[in-house]
Amino acid sequence: MMLRTFTLLLLCIWLNRGMTSMAAVESQPELWIESNYPQAPWENITLWCKSPSRVSSKFLLLKDNTQMTWIHPPYKTFQVSFFIGALTESNTGLYRCCYWNEKGWSKPSKILELEAPGQLPKPIFWIQAETPPFPGCNVNILCHGWLQDLVFMLFKEGYTEPIDYQVPTGTMAIFSIDNLAPENEGIYICRTHIQMLPTLWSEPSNPLKLVVAGLYPKPTLTAHPGPILAPGESLSLRCQGPIYGMTFALMRLEDLKKPYYYKKPIKNEAYFYFQALKTQDTGHYLCFYYDGSYRGSLLSDILKIWVTDTFPKTWLLVQPSPVIQMGQNVSLRCGGLMDGVGLALHKKGEEKPLQFLDATSNTGNNSFFLKNVTYRDAGIYSCHYYLTWKTSIKMATYNTVELIVVAWPSSVFKVGKTITLQCRVSHPVLEFSLEWEETTTFQKFSVDGDFIITNIEGQGTGTYSCSYRIESHANIWSHRSEPLKLVGPAVTGFLPWNSILNEAIRVSLTVQFLSLLLLVLWLQWKCRRLRLREAWLLGTAQGVAMLVILIALLCCGLCNGALTEEIEIIMPTPKPELWAETNFPQAPWKNVTLWCRSPSGSTKEFVLLKDGTGWIATRPASEQVRAAFPLGALTQSHTGSYHCHSWEEMAVSEPSEALELVGTDILPKPVISASLPIRGQELQIRCKGWLEGLGFALYKMGEQEPVQQLGAVGREAFFTIQRMEDKEEGNYSCRTHTEKQPFKWSEPSAPLELVIKELYPKPFFKTWASPVVTPGSRVTFNCSTSREHMSFILYKDGNEIASSDPVWGNPGTSTAHFLIISVGIGDGGNYSCRYYDFSIWSEPSDPVELIVTEFYPKPTLLAQPGPVVLPGKNVTLRCQGIFQGMRFALLQEGAHAPLQFQSASGTSVDFLLHTVGAEDFGNYSCVYYETTMSNRGSYLSTPLMIWVTDTFPRPWLSAEPSSVVTMGQNVTLWCQGPVHGVGYILHKEGEATSMQLWDSTSNEGAFPIINISGASIGRYSCCYHPDWMSPIKIQPSNTLELIVTGLLPKPSLLVQPGPMVVPGENMTFQCQGELPDSTFVLLKEGTQQPIEQQRPSGYRADFWMPVVRDQDSGVYSCVYYLDSAPLVASNHSNSLEIWVTDKPPKPSLSAWPSTVFKLGKDITLQCRGPLPGVEFVLEHDGEEAPQQFSEDGDFVIGNMEGKGIGNYSCSYRLQAYPDIWSEPSDSLELVGAAGPVAQECTVGNIVRSTLIVVVVVALGIVLAIEWKKWPRLRTRGSETDGRDQTIVLEECNQDGEPGTATNSPSSALQGVSVEQTVPI
């Protein structure tokens, strides 16, 4: 229900919203009435509409939400008039006006209601508060009457006469209430009348409730189902206070002048419903309550409600780089526009999110952490908003990040081994290149990005980087990647002293043993050479030598045993828990479901078994690592003993404790257990009953009545024996029963015998590091006693898991070290140890709670009253979790163990730090964990710094994007400090009011200033503003000057000696203005603060920068402002890019019109660099001297006789530094072009020439062979002695194919040789 009243809560609400709400008010036009009939204004009415801050070209008048008329004046103006004339029945209605700006029509003005003739319009009534939010501040009540020269009357409920009146010259009266007090509370209205007609009154304004806030504690405001919903969905806002019978009110900060929602309470709370949300319902809501005397509470915390159909996009950044070396840690930083919303990290290919950040830790800038990354962590990651309620809002992701893990198998070389360097990007590339910084000539190319580096003779070590090029720009290479250093093997740590000593003893004893053995052999060899009378001496020597050898061996064993060795704990698969649930508490056997839960996060399935019948069912593990086995109504077939197992990938757990179902009308038999009874100490007896909501009774054998009884306390109960003495010994059992009478009882448990035995004192037991660990950590337990030669047993949750044998060679204390190499999620729990000798055991040690974190979402940690405390005072740290029934631990950075433990029935606990001192200063965090399932814990809360001091640390004020901005631009002032959870306040020099940011949940406060105007110029500072009463001193921040540019002619900026300077030299910026008596400001792009300011006597300021460095490179400009108008500055000067380097950047080289020569055409090569005043030179491959010089960088290349073809590059030098040349540009190749006919002729000529060469070479070979034969034949002819020589034709049968018919003589002879005489 909407009550048509307004309420003042003196908390300066709209000041909290800063300039945002102010800008919104300024953009609303003003509407009023003028008439030339002062005694009867309805006879002739003109409506005026005025723009608040700018001229406009169009104005629009609306009546009853429909367009009535619009005016387009011939020139832009601030205000226009709409003539109405005499007021008649047709003219009555609701009027508003708008004006046109660059974004469209403005917001409508306030509604003017014209009623019947003879009546004045009803005035508008609202509040303005400009003072601090406590009784005693000043309040202005504003009444707007629409007409000028009216009499304004202020009335208060309970008074017949007006309490105040005014006759202003305008249309509005301001009634001031100074020093607000409780008697000023109540309901106010205002009325107007014409001065000449005191009997003609207007209608009363809407009533206004004046509530003095801060007299009651603030309520809490929550949203259901959540604070972020889609349009059309329903929302319920619940306001809850500590006091019954109050009236509750809901306000929206964006509409403070609109009526508020109010509700009568339901006990001490009220619900505000929104059936179908709209996007304009987005805003900041708060609530309060008040009594019948209008005494109000403090405002609740502001609750931001988002109504949107699409989430704003999130972005994801990787630190230090998306290409990460294996084994390192990586941070994935996720951010978005929404704060107070959970975030989830997703990996492509994975169904479930990898990590979560809860809503309380999301401040718009958060990080997920991947530790000790491997190649399994490589992939494409994205982050999304994570909601715990259902909604139809679409999720959007701005970007994804591909994480690349490089250097396989590591970045440490072993001589003779190889390492694969992997260069990766998230898009297709043409080719990768690998550079080695130690060798300039080294370069490798790869298509897939894998480079194999060998380390022969240790020569592969060094620093490598890679780059790539894409197909569309094949001549352009990317920037180099971050360098990766490959190093040789080195000592990465120190061996433990025990290991060094152990190894030294082994080597020493081995040398002694070998020496003595050689001595015995030498004596035996001598035996053969000695006389018999010396044999007894030899025997004695041999005996002594053997005795020494035996003693050495014995010492070896004793020395090795004297060293304390670490005993690795082989953790068994955790035992699951089995219990029963029912929806019939008085008759649970009517419907029973068995549940099995495992503490191990890697459990895949659960198996339920029944004794005598074996396997019953298998169920997959849920997200809570549990499974349900419904049995239904119990029958005789269900009776028996049940237990369950959990299955992992390679192991099956031990069976759970047996749950015995006896039958109908009888509850399952409970299980009883207790710790070791120790004389004179307290003893707790545990009775586990399998069902929720049961009563428990403890019995002692020989007594009929229960020894102790407990009501419904869950599935288990603990009976306490305050002091264990001899009379308490005996056999105990326990039973369970239903909560309500008539009781249904269980069978008695198995008996438990309690006997007090003689015991040694308990050992000293601790962990070497903190017992709060992350999965994968290394944990060592140290158990020791002052007694000698003791054996040790390590227990987890009362079960033995490891043991240590006695050490005989070490006098003094006995110690055992138990080691968990890599802690799993199921390894948490309560650990203890005992020691024993042959017959006597020790008392159990004090338990150590090993908490394995990162299983549940992290809690939040807050300090009350605040994180800054005076020495000697108390502070309460509240740890707020998510789940009920958890146990909480408080940790301090640098402390070995948690400071405090507490168990909670709700979701939060309070840790008290009493009388804090300097030693309590530091970072605190908390964690919660469940004690029933291996101490599975949450992530650690965000650290909270506790300051023990009498003075707040000084914050720092900065501007984003810069403190020098143009008129109309938006700027955000950031107040940053190390103290968390404290509000900030922003001061402007010369103004009494301040902008406040309440309940900051981060360590920085944002103060946005929208649409910078002349009123925004000034000097600002900020300080902390704690929301608790504290005597701690507050220091102001630095002073920031907000300068607005664009109001004076721009100056000129020069630099001497030039835009490029060698590191270590000096440079001077000269800023020349046009007006005298000016202050000059030097600016650098990318920095938020000015570099330097000067007030010279003339028109120019010289900014001297001595010994410049590389980081001084950048883009500079300057502005100036007059002393008569400080901080109202000129336009920016021209920008100057400064290079501080001894090697100018390389230029670019391009060809026009193309890189292909055409017949008779030239090509112009264009060399361009980033610096002015340079000389360019063009180089052609193959020519020693540069070819051409040019000041403008243009080179004309001709192709006479094909001399223009080839690779070109260019470089330049500054005229101020003629000896310093830049790097050469990337090479550019010019090629020639031939027509199709010429190309075909060329190819034909090449083919023909090749054939001619082959033929000529073949003929030459044949002629050479024949030439060699000729002298040999001639010599044989001279040696025939007159006989005819014959040439045997042995190849005659080879003229035809074998086996074919032929007419040759050879075929008839069938292979017989035929000789034919040939004259030579």
Curated annotation (Swiss-Prot):
Residues 19-504, 556-1320 are extracellular. Glycans are attached at residues 44, 329, 365, 372, 591, 731, 782, 830, 874, 923, 970, 1011, 1066, 1131, 1207. The keyword rRNA-binding does not apply. It comes from the Eukaryota. One of its GO terms (biological process) is regulation of DNA-templated transcription. Expressed in pituitary gland, testis and liver. Isoform 2 is expressed pituitary gland and testis. GO terms for molecular function: activin receptor antagonist activity; coreceptor activity; inhibin binding. Disulfide bonds join 49-97, 334-383, 423-466, 783-833, 879-926, 1071-1118, 1167-1210. GO terms for cellular component: extracellular region; membrane. InterPro entries: Ig-like_dom (IPR007110), Ig-like_dom_sf (IPR036179), Ig-like_fold (IPR013783), Ig-like_Receptors_ImmuneReg (IPR050412), Ig_sub (IPR003599), Ig_sub2 (IPR003598). Residues 1-18 form the signal peptide. The keyword Glycoprotein applies. Keywords: Disulfide bond, Glycoprotein, Immunoglobulin domain, Membrane, Receptor, Repeat, Secreted, Signal, Transmembrane, Transmembrane helix. The chain crosses the membrane at residues 505-525, 535-555. Residues 29-113, 115-212, 224-308, 312-399, 401-482, 572-665, 662-756, 761-853, 857-942, 949-1044, 1049-1134, 1145-1226 form the Ig-like C2-type domain. Pfam families: Ig_2, Ig_3. Residues 526-534 are cytoplasmic. Interacts with INHA; the interaction is not confirmed by standard receptor binding assays. Interacts with ACVR1B; the interaction appears to be ligand-dependent as it is diminished by inhibin B and activin A. Interacts with ACVR2A, ACVR2B, ACVRL1 and BMPR1B. Interacts with HECTD1. Seems to be a coreceptor in inhibin signaling, but seems not to be a high-affinity inhibin receptor. Antagonizes activin A signaling in the presence or absence of inhibin B. Necessary to mediate a specific antagonistic effect of inhibin B on activin-stimulated transcription. This is Immunoglobulin superfamily member 1. It comes from Rattus norvegicus.
